[in-house]
Amino acid sequence: MSIITFNKSTSDREDFLVNKSPYQIVPLHDRFFYKEYLDTLPNPEFDNKILIHSSFTTRPFSNKQIGNKKCNDNLKGYELIANKLRTKYILFHGPANIDDYHNFTNGLSNIDLNIKDKIICIEIPAFSKAFIDYIKQNPINNSLNNSNNQQINQSSNQPLNPYYNFICEYLNTVTSFKPVNNQFQIVLDTAHLHSNGLNGIEIIKLCNEYLNYYDFIHMNGNIKDQFKPDIHTPIDSVNDKIKFSEYVVRNIAKLNKICICETKDGDYEYYQELSEEYGYSIVDKNKLYAY
């Protein structure tokens, strides 16, 4: 049984001391890494599965940031937050454009160099238009060049959507990476996968093929058409444009994963109904969660 949870505000520090449910927090600014901010964070007496989502100002795969002092300090800052809150999980967005994609392995190495003893989660983002065009113009066949992931790519004898093939190649960069100091996982975001050219059936196929490589899913709907910048909405709601979104919700429930719903235009009751209908568990209602 998968569990539905949400983004949590950090405004009420005391909640960290009592909330043992999994959830996601999103520090939005680099100033959060100042010692004064860290001193305000409580130190819970228990370990928890809090996913610390990095801000967009930290771009560890960018030519302008990879390896420089500001980027490295930010990476270390997320480690300090994780240590204080007694969680292992830190999320960074993977490359969203061609230049960053060419830095993928170097960026992973730099993250691994600057953070210690954590579970680093690389989220597949919505790709830029130029990146989508690049994938379209450079289609790849089912990749078998990564021995650690051959079974993943051999699981279907049918020709696949070229965007699906590329996404497998993209994810294999993470799953085949050999870290020294951390564990590395992926994070699949259903809204981003829709933006990148997948329908609901292909999304579930991907979830199943990489089942052993992630603990968290971002389970979001998308009000935009494919190949457009994503805007989240509750999955399988009236405005969600993911094709076969009901199939996605029905099948993710069976994966035993932590599903973070990153929306602001829904309500707890919608997700509660989703949980009851499809067999999820759901965290208790909390005024600090965004729905």
Q: Where is each model-derived feature located?
A:
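Active-site acidic/histidine proton-transfer and metal-coordination neighborhood
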Residues: 60-142, 151-188, 195
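N-terminal pre-domain/capping segments
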Residues: 1-79, 83, 181-183, 285-291
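C-terminal helical cap(s) of enzyme catalytic domains, especially alpha/beta-barrels
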Residues: 268-291
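A structural motif
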Residues: 20, 84-87, 117, 214, ...
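Gly/Pro-rich active-site loop or hairpin
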Residues: 61-69, 194-258, 264-265
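Hydrophobic faces of well-ordered beta-strands that scaffold small-molecule active sites
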Residues: 1-8, 23-25, 50-54, 90-92, ...
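Alpha-helix-loop-beta-strand connector modules within alpha/beta enzyme cores
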Residues: 46-52, 111-115, 244-251
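Acidic-and-aromatic substrate-binding clefts and catalytic sites of carbohydrate-active enzymes
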Residues: 9-14, 25-40, 57-71, 96-102, ...
